[in-house]
Design a protein with these regions (language model features):
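Active-site donor-binding segments of glycosyltransferases and PAPS-dependent sulfotransferases
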Residues: 1-19
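Active-site proximal beta-strand in glycosyltransferases
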Residues: 9-11, 25-59, 89, 108
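Membrane-proximal helix-turn-helix segments that form the acceptor-binding/catalytic region
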Residues: 4, 39, 50-88, 95-97
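Conserved donor-binding/catalytic core segment of Leloir-type glycosyltransferases
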Residues: 87-89, 124-148, 154-167
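Short, conserved loop/helix-junction motifs that constitute active-site signature segments
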Residues: 22-29, 80-83, 131-133
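Short, well-ordered alpha-helix to beta-strand connector turns
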Residues: 6-8, 28-29, 83-86, 161
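Acidic anion/phosphate-binding donor-loop and adjacent secondary structure
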Residues: 97, 102, 114-136
Length: 168
């Protein structure tokens, strides 16, 4: 309402369900959308698969059921892209490329910021590594899922002698 009416611009970070906020943005307000990625559930089947890649349900039925949500998402992005002075940035070159593929948006890249103070020079105060071995290992962070490549990682490591530590 009032805050947006007096603002010069709006910075919106996309997330599940944030694009409908665009319905409430005055058309004269410049918007910068930091698009983390187009909604995977609407545009890819990766979220509709088990960790081994097996479909959770019939993928054709899932795609049909999500067609209305996909159209709504496309309409919201088309509305944003038609607003004068509005811009879209991805958080990686991959996200920027996906914005072009999915929405036709020419997106720049706004890299995530890293605070080097979070990583002290002296690691002696760090918690002890929970991995019991002294050999090399691979770390995966996040929920185990097909979308995050968990199964692909396990397959690629098979026979290499590398261990996998999964956190999350």
């Amino acid at each position: 309402g009032e805050a947006m009416a007096s603002a010069d611009a709006l910075h919106l970070v996309s997330g599940d369900g944030s694009l409908p906020l665009l319905d409430h943005v005055p058309e004269v307000l410049r918007v910068h959308l930091h698009l983390l990625e187009p909604h995977r559930g609407l545009y890819e089947d990766t979220l509709h698969r088990l960790v081994d890649g097996t479909p959770k349900r019939n993928l054709s039925l899932t795609k049909a059921a999500l067609s209305r949500a996909r159209k709504r998402d496309q309409a919201l992005m088309a509305s944003l892209l038609s607003m004068e002075g509005s811009r879209v940035s991805g958080n990686s070159t991959f996200s920027a490329e996906r914005a072009k593929e999915v929405y036709g948006a020419d997106a720049g890249v706004l890299w995530p910021c890293v605070d080097t103070e979070e990583f002290p020079q002296d690691p002696s105060g760090d918690p002890e590594n929970p991995y019991p071995g002294n050999d090399e290992y691979v770390v995966c962070i996040g929920r185990a899922s097909w979308a995050k490549g968990t199964w692909e990682t396990v397959s690629m490591l098979s026979g290499t002698g590398l261990s996998l530590t999964h956190v999350g």
